[in-house]
C-alpha cells in the first residue's frame, strides 16, 4: 500500500548531509482551569504581558485558552526545554489555576459564557476578537476550546539543492514549494499514523454532545463519560474541530498558484448558512463577513503550507511572494503524559515521517481523492485500535491491514532514522522507531489506549484534574533552564509597549478600518 521509496532512501543514504539543519518549532494550546476543573474566568495573567504582541505566550480562541510558542530551533532538546520554561514561568504566575492536560474540555457547558480572547483597543486587536465572535456564532464556543499541539517543520536548503540541483530565485520558490506539496499529499494519504500512535482523545464528557443525537456507537460510563472502545482522537472527528461547510471548497495541494486561488476564492464565496447569522445585531458586530471563510486562517486543515508573513500581508500573499517556507502539522492531540503536552519521542517521529513524506512519490490529488483519504483518517480516528482494521488507497476498493501498513512504513522510517542518527550521533531516532513500531502488534501501547484506561477508572474529569495538579506542582518547583525571570519581565514590558504603540498609531475608527479588511 505504501509507495516504493527504496531508490529515494538509497539516494538519502548517499547524501546524509542533506538532512543537516532541519528546523522546527512547537505551539501548544491549553485551557486555564480552576482546581475543580472548571474554566477559569479571570483575564489573561498579568505577568504574561500582552497576548496581542508577546513573542512566546498568547491566547487562542478564548481568554482562558493559552498558547505557547517556541522560536524556530535546530535542536530538539533546546526547543523542548524552552517550551518547558514557558510552562514553568506560567505555572508560577497563574495563582491557583492549572493548565488542562487534555485536548477535550470537560467542565464546560455549551450555554456557558466563554469569554473570547481580548487583545486591547487597536483595530488589529478588535479584529482578532471579532473573528473569534464569528467562530463562536458559526461553530459554537465549545468546539473552539478544544486544544492541540502544532509542529512546524522545514527541510534545510541543502536538502533541496541535493534533490533539485543548484536552485535560486524563482526557480527555488517553485521547486521547494512543489517539494512541500509532495509532503502534504503524502501526509493526507498516510498521516493517519499520527492519531493512531498519539491520539489521546478517545472519550468525551457528556456535556460535549450538547444533547444532540449522534450516530456514533458510544459506550457510556456511570459518571456520564462517552467513549468508543477503539477510538484514538475524537478531537479530529466530526465531533471535534472540523468544518463540514468547507468540504466542498475543492482546494487542492498540487500547485502553489492553484492552492492560493482556491483559498482566495473561499474568502470571497458567500455562504447562505452564515448569512442567516447576520453581520450585526443591536449594534454589535457578529462576524467579519458572511463568506465561507471570514479570513484564511478559518480553513480547517490537518496540515498547512506556511511562510512567515510581513506586516499587513495575508498568509496566501506571503506564499505567492516567496513560496512555501515550512509546514505546519496540526493533527497532534495534547500529550497527557507530558507536563508540556508534547515530548521528544513525538518530535523525532514527526521528523522521520516528514522526511519520508518528502522522499515518497506522491501523485497529484484531485479534490475527490482528497475526500477519499478522509475515509482512512476517520477509520483510525473512530476505531484505529480495532483488531483486523483495514485501510484503502485513495478511492480504490482494495483494502490492507493497518497493522501491516504500519510495519511497512516503519521499515522505511528505520532507514531514515539511521541516516539522521549518522549525522547527529547516537541512536535516538532508531530508538524511537523501535519503541513505536511495537504499537502495531500491541495497540494497548498507544496513547489512546493508555489514557482510556485511566479515564474509565476515574472519568475524564478525574483524570484531567489529577494530571493538572501533578504537573502544576512539578512545573512550579522546577528551575528555569534557558530563559531567566528577567527575560520574561522584559518581554512582558516590551509586549505591553508594542500594544500601546499599536493603539496610539490607529487613526481610523474601527468601523471604517473594518470595511477595508472585511
Curated annotation (Swiss-Prot):
It catalyses: L-cysteine + L-glutamate + ATP = gamma-L-glutamyl-L-cysteine + ADP + phosphate + H(+). Its EC number is 6.3.2.2. Pathway: Sulfur metabolism; glutathione biosynthesis; glutathione from L-cysteine and L-glutamate: step 1/2. It comes from the Bacteria. One of its GO terms (molecular function) is metal ion binding. Transmembrane segments: none annotated. One of its GO terms (cellular component) is cytosol. GO terms for biological process: glutathione biosynthetic process. Keywords: ATP-binding, Glutathione biosynthesis, Ligase, Nucleotide-binding. It is an enzyme of class 6 (ligase). NCBIfam families: glu_cys_ligase. HAMAP family: Glu_cys_ligase. Belongs to the glutamate--cysteine ligase type 1 family. Type 1 subfamily. This is Glutamate--cysteine ligase.
Amino acid at each position: 500500500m505504501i509507495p516504493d521509496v527504496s531508490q529515494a532512501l538509497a539516494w538519502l543514504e548517499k547524501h546524509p548531509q542533506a538532512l543537516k539543519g532541519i528546523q522546527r518549532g512547537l505551539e501548544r494550546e491549553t485551557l486555564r482551569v480552576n482546581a475543580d476543573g472548571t474554566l477559569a474566568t479571570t483575564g489573561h495573567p498579568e505577568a504574561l504581558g500582552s497576548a496581542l504582541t508577546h513573542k512566546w505566550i498568547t491566547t487562542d480562541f478564548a481568554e482562558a485558552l493559552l498558547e505557547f510558542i517556541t522560536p524556530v530551533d535546530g535542536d530538539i532538546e533546546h526547543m523542548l526545554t524552552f517550551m518547558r520554561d514557558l510552562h514553568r514561568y506560567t505555572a508560577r504566575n497563574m495563582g491557583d489555576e492549572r493548565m488542562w492536560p487534555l485536548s477535550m474540555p470537560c467542565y464546560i457547558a455549551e450555554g456557558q459564557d466563554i469569554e473570547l480572547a481580548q487583545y486591547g483597543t487597536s483595530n488589529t486587536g478588535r479584529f482578532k476578537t471579532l473573528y473569534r465572535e464569528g467562530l463562536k456564532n458559526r461553530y459554537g464556543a465549545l468546539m473552539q476550546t478544544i486544544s492541540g499541539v502544532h509542529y512546524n517543520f522545514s527541510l534545510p536548503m541543502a536538502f533541496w539543492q541535493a534533490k533539485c540541483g543548484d536552485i535560486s530565485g524563482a526557480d527555488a520558490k517553485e521547486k521547494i514549494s512543489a517539494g512541500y506539496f509532495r509532503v502534504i499529499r503524502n501526509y493526507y494519504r498516510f498521516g493517519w499514523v499520527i492519531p493512531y500512535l498519539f491520539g489521546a482523545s478517545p472519550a468525551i464528557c457528556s456535556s460535549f454532545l450538547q444533547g444532540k443525537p449522534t450516530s456514533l456507537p458510544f459506550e457510556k460510563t456511570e459518571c456520564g463519560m462517552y467513549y468508543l472502545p477503539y477510538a484514538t482522537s475524537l478531537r479530529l472527528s466530526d465531533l471535534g474541530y472540523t468544518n463540514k461547510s468547507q468540504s466542498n471548497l475543492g482546494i487542492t495541494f498540487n500547485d502553489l498558484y492553484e492552492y492560493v486561488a482556491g483559498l482566495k476564492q473561499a474568502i470571497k464565496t458567500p455562504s447562505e448558512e452564515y448569512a442567516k447569522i447576520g453581520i450585526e445585531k443591536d449594534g454589535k458586530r457578529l462576524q467579519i463577513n458572511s463568506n465561507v471563510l471570514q479570513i484564511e486562517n478559518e480553513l480547517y486543515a490537518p496540515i498547512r503550507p506556511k511562510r512567515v508573513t510581513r506586516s499587513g500581508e495575508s498568509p496566501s500573499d506571503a506564499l505567492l511572494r516567496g513560496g512555501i517556507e515550512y509546514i505546519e502539522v496540526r493533527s497532534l492531540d495534547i500529550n497527557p503524559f507530558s507536563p508540556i503536552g508534547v515530548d521528544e519521542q513525538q518530535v523525532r517521529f514527526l521528523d522521520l515521517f516528514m522526511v519520508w513524506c518528502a522522499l515518497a512519490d506522491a501523485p497529484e490529488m484531485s479534490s475527490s481523492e482528497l475526500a477519499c483519504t478522509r475515509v482512512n483518517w476517520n477509520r483510525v480516528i473512530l476505531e484505529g485500535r480495532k483488531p483486523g482494521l483495514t485501510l484503502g488507497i485513495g478511492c480504490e476498493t482494495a483494502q490492507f491491514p493497518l497493522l501491516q501498513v504500519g510495519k511497512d512504513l516503519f521499515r522505511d522510517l528505520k532507514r531514515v532514522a539511521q541516516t539522521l542518527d549518522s549525522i547527529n550521533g547516537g541512536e535516538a531516532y532508531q530508538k524511537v522507531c523501535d519503541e513505536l513500531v511495537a504499537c502495531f502488534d500491541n495497540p494497548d501501547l498507544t496513547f489512546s489506549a493508555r489514557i482510556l484506561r485511566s479515564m474509565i477508572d476515574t472519568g475524564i474529569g478525574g483524570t484531567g484534574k489529577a494530571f493538572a495538579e501533578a504537573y502544576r506542582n512539578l512545573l512550579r518547583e522546577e528551575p528555569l533552564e534557558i530563559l531567566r525571570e528577567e527575560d520574561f519581565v522584559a518581554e512582558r514590558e516590551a509586549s505591553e509597549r508594542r500594544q500601546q504603540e499599536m493603539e496610539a498609531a490607529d487613526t481610523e475608527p474601527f468601523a471604517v478600518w473594518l470595511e477595508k479588511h472585511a
